[in-house]
Amino acid sequence: MIEPSEGNKQGRDFVHLHIHTEYSLLDGACRIDQLMDRVKECGQTAIACTDHGVMYGCVQFYKAAKKAGIKPIIGCEVYVATRTRFDKVNKIDGNNHLILLCKNETGYKNLAKLVSAAFIEGFYSKPRVDKQLLEQYHEGLICLSACLAGEIPQAILSGDYERAKASALWYRDLFGEGNYYIELQDHGLEEDNIVLPQLIKLARETGIPMAATNDSHYLRKEDAKMQAILLCIQTGRTMQDADRMEFQTDEFYVKTTDEMYDLFA
């Protein structure tokens, strides 16, 4: 999120709200202790932890941030079932991504309940919540529309802008004004060029505020290869495989405040 701040010598401030630590298993390459060093190096004063579907690292993250004098924001990038968490039909029941951040203790308890239910009741390839659970446990949480795998970007990519708009309004009405944000990302992907203008249009039409993030899976640009190796281990491939799963650019790192302003301000 980009905000003006008197405390920044350049009048700039930025907080990363979309971060994957090593607890996004075989995907995130941000070691928590090193992440705090990187945040301080960037002159940033707060950081969120939003691992994929889990809260394994929250306690370690919280303690490390406090020790470093950085404000910790507990969160999770949850998987939302395309139908319900009980529907588990091959090639039909997938998931979309959604960022949830804790505002307070109530939010933390509700996020823990959501993640637990995702494993106990909704697990199908991934631990999944559904909209019924979100309706039950949304209090105390801030919600961001997530990356290209989010429900709203996916609707845009499928050419259904009205569905994207309806989904955004549903989340806005559920979480309440000021607690739901359209998430803007730009990693230099072809899909970003399609989705970004439509997300901005949607936000302006609905009055839903926007939050700029970077889907950070590693600390620095030069760490992209390390994260690519993790993906190979996850998928049983090698770096030599032409069709291996990989991120298409090396922009998925913890960017400096100036880099984020250059992208979005």
PLM region spans:
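Phosphodiester-processing cores and adjacent nucleic acid-binding clamps
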Residues: 1-265
